[in-house]
């Protein structure tokens, strides 16, 4: 993320400057992985338009398009895309337009919205991040139509076990 963002990648060599040069590190890393273990074992994740701390990209469409078009020919196994908080940036459609591998999408889905996204061909698969943390039995809950436990945002990305290993399995009448 830091290499792709123009506000943090202030390098003046071949790895900084325009979107193509900022993407170079990611491109070379993916190329090396594909060469070493094969494209079928390599996937990568992007989060266009998602700021983190002071890292943001003022032109995430250009940066993302540039990266995806550059690595399209590598034929990686999958691309995992996190939705942008700014809904004017449709990260999933951007990925579909500029990359042609299996697309895994993440947008804080609930089971019903995940199903809708797959039916609408927004992605080939969905991922559950936060809900996976707060539901150790996520698969069983979804399959059984049981409600998902809410996650505690205060415990995300913190040290220790609290919020990671202390959520209970679903129980009837709980």
Stretches with model-predicted labels:
Residues 1-174:
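Flavin-dependent oxidoreductase catalytic cores
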């Amino acid at each position: 993320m830091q290499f792709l963002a123009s506000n943090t990648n202030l390098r003046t060599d071949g790895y900084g400057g325009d979107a193509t040069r900022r993407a170079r590190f990611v491109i070379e890393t993916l190329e090396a992985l594909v060469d070493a273990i094969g494209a079928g074992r390599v996937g990568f994740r992007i989060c266009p338009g998602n700021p983190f701390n002071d890292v943001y990209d003022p032109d995430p469409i250009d940066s993302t398009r540039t990266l995806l078009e550059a690595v399209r020919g590598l034929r990686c196994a999958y691309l995992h895309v996190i939705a942008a908080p700014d809904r004017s940036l449709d990260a999933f459609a951007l990925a579909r337009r500029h990359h042609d591998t299996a697309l895994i999408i993440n947008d804080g889905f609930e089971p019903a919205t995940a199903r809708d996204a797959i039916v609408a061909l927004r992605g080939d698969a969905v991922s559950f991040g936060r809900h996976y943390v707060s539901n150790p039995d996520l698969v069983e809950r979804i399959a059984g139509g049981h409600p998902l436990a809410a996650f505690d945002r205060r415990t995300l990305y913190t040290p220790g076990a609290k919020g990671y290993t202390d959520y209970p399995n679903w129980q009837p009448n709980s």
